[in-house]
Amino acid sequence: MLSFINSAELFSLILTLATVITGSIFFLDKYRWQPQREKETGVTDKEQTGWVAQARSMFPVLFAILIIRSFIIEPFQIPSGSMQPTLLPGDFIGVEKFAYGLHDPVFHKTLIPTGKPQRGDITVFIDPENPKIDLIKRIVGLPGDTIIYRDKTLYIKPACNGQKVCPAAYEVPKQFVGVTKFTELGTDLDEYKEHLGNVEHRILRDPNLPEMYSRYYQQPGSPVGEWVVPKGHYFAMGDNRDNSLDSRYWGFMPEQNLVGKATFIWISFTFNHNPDSSWPSWLPNGVRFNRIGAIH
């Protein structure tokens, strides 16, 4: 995977290397160089200066950052509108790294499994088509499920899992909320309240945009718009149903691609700059304090 390192993985690699290097210096100096130095010169650790002292002081900080970022919480920024209205461009979220397992920070191999994604979870994962980037979508289908998306309506036939009577397919419940203030390409969007598993959340649909059946991923042996989720994979969709490149188009998300579970928004910025403004477009021009909190 090193030939396809995304920005988050590259940072993890650099952070890991820096931690290993400064840690090696820390322990070499503490248990070998320092005793020899004090014996020969009488210079104590507190009086020591230079690059060795700097490396020793950096190690605890880098080690703490590595542990927190690799195994506890990692920050991510939402760059697009595919998860509107749940997540907006400019939201900065916290992702639980331990929700689905503890992974090594470089090769992303599972060290200790801790759980499985549940229907309705919002997950960050490595793009199956482009390992250089991470995606964020909502888990709709679990291994063994049959997912049907037809006429912009979602149906789920849960996996049988050895039951004597297998569950029947059902339409995922939703209620119309109204026309949203969010617009895509100048078109107002319909907003619905959807009940997916134990999660109640909002979705958007564009009433003027037809379904792109010709672009859907067609699973061998299944009709267009119908998918059977393989073992060890998941079916993920964006809440902005007509503006999301997701499992409907590229297929299934492998379990090993999971990065973590999105759980909260810790800050949210706006970047709505006037075209004539001299303010750099990459700098925020406002803060949405009402966005801070848990994600559903």
Language-model-detected regions and their locations in the chain:
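Soluble "head" domains of membrane/secretory-pathway proteins
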Residues: 2-37, 46-47, 51, 85-296
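Transmembrane helix-loop junctions in multipass membrane proteins, especially transporters and channels
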Residues: 33-38, 74, 78
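Juxtamembrane inter-helical linkers in multi-pass membrane proteins
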Residues: 40-42
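Transmembrane alpha-helices and immediately adjacent membrane-cytoplasm interface residues
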Residues: 49-77, 98, 102
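Acidic/histidine-enriched ion/cofactor-binding microenvironments in catalytic or ligand-binding pockets
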Residues: 81
